[in-house]
Swiss-Prot record:
Source organism of the structure: Phaeosphaeria nodorum (strain SN15 / ATCC MYA-4574 / FGSC 10173) (Glume blotch fungus)
InterPro entries the record matches: Mediator_Med5_fun
Quaternary data: Component of the Mediator complex.
Record's subcellular location: Nucleus
GO molecular function: transcription coregulator activity
Homology family: Belongs to the Mediator complex subunit 5 family.
Protein name listed in UniProt: Mediator of RNA polymerase II transcription subunit 5
BP-aspect Gene Ontology terms: regulation of transcription by RNA polymerase II
One term under GO cellular component: mediator complex
Protein role: Component of the Mediator complex, a coactivator involved in the regulated transcription of nearly all RNA polymerase II-dependent genes. Mediator functions as a bridge to convey information from gene-specific regulatory proteins to the basal RNA polymerase II transcription machinery. Mediator is recruited to promoters by direct interactions with regulatory proteins and serves as a scaffold for the assembly of a functional preinitiation complex with RNA polymerase II and the general transcription factors.
Amino acid sequence: MCVPAKQGTLHAKSPLPGLKIAGLLLRPRAANASSVDPRVIIYLERLLALKKVDASDVLSSAFQYSKDRLPKTGDDGSSKDSGWHNPPELEEVVFHRLSKAFQAEERPVNSTEGLRTLVVVTRWMQTMVTSHTSDTMIQAMAGIQQQPQQQSINVREGLGMLVVGVIENQKMLNILNKHHIKNCKSPGRSRKSNTTFTTNLATGEWRSERRSRTETQDLKSLRSNFEAVDWIFPTINTRAGLYIFLNSLIDSQNMATDLITAAFDILANAMYRSEPSQNMFCLKSFLINKIPILLLQISSSMFPMTAELSITQALSHVDPNAFPAFSQGFDDMLGNTNSLADVRQDFLNACALHGLITTATVERLLGETPMQGPPGTKYDKSTLLEQCKSNFDKISMYIDELDNLDGNAGAIVGAIAEFIPHLCETQMTMYLKQLSSLLFKKPQAIDVILQFTSPASILRPLCQILDDWHYDSDQGEYQPVYDEFGAVLVLVMTFMYRYDLTYHDIGIGAESFVARLMTKGNQSMLPDEMTDEQSKHLGHWLKGLYDAGNEGLSNDVFASCSPREFYFIVPTLFKQTVMALSAGILTFESVKGGLEYLMETFLLPSLIGGLIWMSSYALIQSHSDLDAIMRIFREVISSAPSSGDAQAMHSTILSIVSSRLEKCLRTIQRRDASRANSIEPLIQAIKGNLHSERSMFASMKELEQWTNAPNSTLHTSLRHTVQQLSQWASTSSIQPNPPSYTHRQVYVSLKIMGASKVIKAIVDELKAQTEASNGAAALDVGVSIICAPTVDDSPVPVAWLSSPIPASNPPRTRLNLREMLKHEFDNAAALVATDPLAAETVVRLHRRVEAQLSSIAENALQGHGSVLNLPNVNMGDMQSQSIPDDITKAIDDAAAASIADDITTMDNKALQRSMDDLTGPDGLDLSSIGMGTGDAGTGDMGAELGNLPDLDLGDMSGMGMDMDMDMAMGGGGDDDWGLDFDNM
């Protein structure tokens, strides 16, 4: 039967409070009911959706008829209402439905609902603990060892999930953080109820299966089990954790000693891994040039410690075999470019340069007389910048000094980062050409530059000037424009390809010249895809390059086509050349003559797009142009340009394209063994240019090392790495040298296996280490891997301190490890029955990860108004979790708050009375509204639910109902109670 049409009008005239509606709906219809009427759930969901009742109404009414609720004061427990309870299945469903609503932040709708819900949930926690504990004690004293019923466990789990949803809800935090909340009843000061509740929850949920297999125990043993649940891993910061963090991205840390030690550990690890000399130089530069500056920045916060004390402690932790005394390692230095014998001396000299220690201290810490002292002059960025502006030749000298590991690199980089925008603003293109040539010839210098400033600070001004580059109205010669434009372009491409950057990384628009060149500059075009102007330009270039009867590349060819237009037709130019040579339209001598033009500095940058296009086209097996491609490869790769500047640019370009060339040549070599003799010289020719990339991608050698061992996969290899780091973290005092580690292993695992399987590998190893009594160190290692900054989808912002132009935030591409762990945490309940230890590990790991990153999330909230990510609650570990004092105070103040933003029609005293009633010792009594249990025939409100007409829920939208603040609630005990956020 449907509700009459006038029903909505009736409710509009005489609305029922939400509490009364919820009480009517949830009132038991029979004593000791054992099943749930499914209509109750449907009606509840619809009433909640229509906002006729709220979460506190539902919870208050459900609590009134819960078995957990204690009798009212003075009740002997034998009243006629004692058997009138709802089945626990109904409570479980209510908890789970409301927890989802709070997790999705659909609730609370207003401040009143939030405050009252918090009060109800808190009281329910206390009474549930009292009820379950008393049952356990009675059973224990009677000698009965009865396991908790599964349904009882489910109810506790449901309430626990609701608690998590409430305390993680951003709206709840905002409500409780109101500054004008005053004169409250202090419901959050007692820690007992929350602590005991979480202990009971952990006992029932996480340990139920394990306990069910144990033998009967006495009361003392049962108490020991309860205490064991409260044990958690201590929060420790291990040497391995910072070692992982710095391996992923060199950045500053709070603890000076650990920072220095970790930097030495990484350098030792690189030596043991036989890293290339360029990698070793980069790590040495970070230790010697960057670390002293970071120490200087944080030295003011180290009181009463001193930088000298931190340095002394750190040097006592480093591996003496990796960093021998200078006199002991002198012989090794003569034949080993990777020797680290001079590193300690250079580091201490750099610290002395920055005033962290005295010159006399260097000798004391070394234990011998140093071979040389610190530099005589400490550079200042502003002074260097003024010198470069007044005398351009100075910049060449300072760029050369970036090779010196003396501590002055930071000032030099700062001057360069401001000098480049100055040249761009003043349109000094000739100086830009010279500066670009100086930089792209020294890739090591570029590595040092990016230790102090962001790629955007160097590249964004250069990209802007490439966009704005134009011919002057009185331009006479156009070839010099190509020369200057090309040098700047090669520097930009060196950065882009060496560090695998995208236009998002440097903060330029998709329509920028460099952005379009990176996405389309390697693709040839079909005739019908080209504009008339592009076709015209292509014809002029083909004729100028290959027409033997012509005078060559005239000034008109350059004048008619700007450099930007030229580089977009380069792949098509190479395609036409290859096809014409293959078809016999062009002779090789003609092609060779044209390539000689392309080997000059003003056109040499075109080889980037041309060689990348040929490397891709050569792998296509549906054409017969391979012979022509190989002849052009030999000419371009093996023939060095004549001038020194052209040779340096040619070598830089080969470094940019070498990885693609090698892959192409080796693929052709495998396909056609007859070409092996002609291909091998080309591979040898580019061998010195290989491995110039500084990207997250692992080499084939590393990948084979991780997967080729018997029974080894990326999963087992990653577990083995976590195991080694965990064991080293706990024994680093007696085993100073770090295990082999590179964060590229995590990157390649993410790319191949995905974030879910990487998390599984970490969790599996944490379980194993926990069982081996090494769980605390392993947990720190796992947290460090998950929290480490990454190139893509970083869990934390990667800020470039002191950079004049901060790095932009690239777009997200996939879930990172932190987000995948959150997904696993959300589904941890499903693991409890099958793998309780895995569930514990996931929850503990997630809580620790969020706790470590919470300060960053809080800063982001203050700066950008984003959602606050509070540490998620581990039900077994809540006692150790720390929440800021201001939030605790807000919760203490919330019970009697006057929230003017939401409650505009109620005065504050009414809300205060309501909250006082909620916390009263006599509990919630609904009999005054005709809802006494066991008296279904009394009053209009006592009708059996089964006798209700079939409600048309679609017709309930007209039921206007106001909030009723006269709300009382029952509970056990008269002590202060509530959520203890201080000790969670």
